[in-house]
Amino acid sequence: MRAYVITIGNEILKGRTINTNAAHIGRVLTYAGYDVIRMVVVPDEIDEIVWAFRDGLSRADLIVSTGGLGPTFDDKTVEALAKALNLELELNQEAFSMVKSKYDRLGVELTKERIKMAYMPKGAKPLPNPVGTAPGVYIEYAGKRILTLPGVPAEMEAILDEALPQLRVPGRYYYEESVVVRGIMESALAPVVNEVMRLNAGLVYVKSHPKGIEIDKPVVEVEVSASGSSEEEVRGRVKEAIRQLVSRAKSINPQCC
Amino acid sequence: MRAYVITIGNEILKGRTINTNAAHIGRVLTYAGYDVIRMVVVPDEIDEIVWAFRDGLSRADLIVSTGGLGPTFDDKTVEALAKALNLELELNQEAFSMVKSKYDRLGVELTKERIKMAYMPKGAKPLPNPVGTAPGVYIEYAGKRILTLPGVPAEMEAILDEALPQLRVPGRYYYEESVVVRGIMESALAPVVNEVMRLNAGLVYVKSHPKGIEIDKPVVEVEVSASGSSEEEVRGRVKEAIRQLVSRAKSINPQCC
């Protein structure tokens, strides 16, 4: 199952905000059994957001977006989502109750900016926001699932946590382990990485992440990961590959790891 | 001038690594006068990287990528770049000298993994890497500029710093300032934001970033920014819009800011 992550917001494009949301979602979905195949960041513009949802729908089984769900003029995600799906935008009664109850508690009136957060594409299901006000949006379309979340990290995380049990890919497990290799240049470790990949072709993925300075002070973190239908099996494959890697790296530099 | 940012690496898609590179590049390019219009993250797969470069070329004047320049099997960026541009991949003599001199210093041989880092599309210019080994790649194609940088942040930043003077958009300035508004819900501030946008239509951009809890403890950071051909003018526009915003916000809650 393939997942696609969309981040909406000019502040990300301008580098004003680091996109920790995409990383969080990527992590959660990977461990939920998905292959995250693409992430995109688009501005607060309808046509760009529409493009992102359509690109996601053409490539993945699950699309998760963050940002653009609030009460301001540049919160355009649900409008764009409706357009991307050719669905009508309507006042969702369940979402309206959620939004209303939040403001009722404070005794403030429901202005059009507040009611805006209860509009959703026809057929969408609002997801309660335990932290903030704007509900998340869940919709199924052409066999694909779309989850639209707020951009505030605490709100995004809370709604995603709630939705996760339904999103998890049944019988699909991911496992990952890393080993830090010191005193071997990444270029010298490359043939070892290649060999371990060959020995476990299609079963594990090995990637080296240089953390030091290639020539003067080489430190390489090697990540080994696997996905499969048994938790025990993927863990076993990763551990065996790590063992192969460490034994070969030690033959280059016995103090490496 | 429009810029497009590509991040290459499975570790970003899996959320193992937070994409600080894209934020850094977005920030630097915004202040260099670009509109960053899209960011994408793609896996270490040729076809996906080719797609990203082509999507960038079809939309932007400058494309900056990070990741996939190293010595390992999954460093595929230059190969994909050559394919995206329909150019031959060749051993770049200038890049070869750069790579060779790094390893010569240590007296180690130039294995094929090390020489790999000197291959570039025909016509590309290598950019010296003062921190690591793999040179950056600069190439002009169909009136567009492409800058390909390593994924290690210190290396990426150093090469980008060096390249920046040539990339800067002449006579284009960006300025941004923020004000923190307390005790006014984002939904109550929305009409104020709208009004300030209307008063300065096309001149400034105003975006509210909720930082607290909408109903119980509202804290909203309002960002005002402008781009234009005079540094003084954009600064003046932003400061005037901030003044309008603060005066209107204070009429809702005098202690707000």
UniProtKB/Swiss-Prot annotation, chains A, B:
Q: What is this protein called?
A: Protein Cmaq_1209
> PANTHER family per the record?
NICOTINAMIDE-NUCLEOTIDE AMIDOHYDROLASE PNCC (PTHR13939), NMN AMIDOHYDROLASE-LIKE PROTEIN YFAY (PTHR13939:SF0)
Q: Which SMART domains does this chain map to?
A: MoCF_biosynth (SM00852)
What family does this chain come from, according to its entry?
Answer: Belongs to the CinA family.
Checking CDD domains in the record gives:
cinA
What is the superkingdom listed in this entry's lineage? Answer: Archaea
